[in-house]
Amino acid sequence: GYIFRNGTIDYTVLDYAETRFGNIALLRRDTYCPFVVARLLQKQPDGTYIWAWGSYFNELPNAESFFHTRINELQ
């Protein structure tokens, strides 16, 4: 997937969806709580990204489950 860097942390976009309330992304990073489900991911002028809400997970299956649940809730 697409990789971006925020500070010293690389994020890989594992999955992404558009909903009627904006986007949602499943991200992987090589640090504590390596999986993030982020809502309203936005690229900044300096090339970094911000998001409005993030839920952090230690295990990929938990992050994937939450990601798909949120997509269904936001459709």
Predicted regions and their residues:
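A short, charged, amphipathic alpha-helix used as a generic interaction element across diverse proteins
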Residues: 58-74
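Short acidic/glycine-enriched loop/turn segments that link adjacent beta-strands
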Residues: 20-21
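Generic detector of leucine side chains in alpha-helical contexts
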Residues: 14, 26-27, 40-41, 60, ...
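Short aromatic-glycine-(Arg/Gly/Cys) micro-motifs in beta-strand/loop hairpins
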Residues: 24-54, 69-70
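Negatively charged, low-complexity tracts enriched in Asp/Glu with abundant Ser/Thr
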Residues: 1-17
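A general marker of short, structured functional hotspots
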Residues: 7, 12, 45, 52, ...
